[in-house]
């Protein structure tokens, strides 16, 4: 069974790269019916203190560098340190965002944020060492359920992050057609090395 699953995953990966239109249709017609199970020692913790927020900044620095590497210039990537992101997280926390850390035993290896005011999810990151274990899917599901007052929460995703978009579609999220941000290297002062867009996705179950 595991070999068949692996072969199926490899086939879908080739389709994603060669025929993204077919892959999109497959994702929308094959929802995830069962998420990975939470394991012993794995939990989410609400960020309450400066030490935890510093952990979030470190996770965000690693996550943003990974996501932005294909589209940002090297100078901007080098700026993405924990100290660079900490002020942003601090301001967001003051303005209604709640952040949660994902722990495996006592090690923080992922994070996600939710904003109850506007029904938005953001800053979904998993460390490189913890990727491929289903943590991202579990955290997104956790975050959505933290917003019961919003039937259709939203989030932003880079158009170049096709793997994430595919996963989110299989979890009931859809692109709304709204472009939240555009980054064009032709514009003066931009940090983008190639043109990219942050797209809005909405949960539609």
Regions found by a protein language model. Give the residues of each.
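Long, charged alpha-helical interface segments
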Residues: 1-27
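A short beta-loop-alpha structural element at the N-terminal edge
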Residues: 43-59
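Conserved GNAT-fold acetyl-CoA-binding loop/helix
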Residues: 64-87
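A short helix-loop-beta-strand connector motif used in the catalytic cores of GNAT acetyltransferases and
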Residues: 83-101, 120
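Conserved beta-strand in the GNAT
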Residues: 101, 106-125
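A short, internal acetyl-CoA/4′-phosphopantetheine-binding micro-motif in the GNAT/acyltransferase core
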Residues: 121-131, 157-158
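Conserved acetyl-CoA pyrophosphate-binding loop and the N-cap/start of the following alpha-helix
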Residues: 130, 134-142
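C-terminal "cap" of GNAT-fold acetyltransferases
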Residues: 153-165, 169-174, 178-205
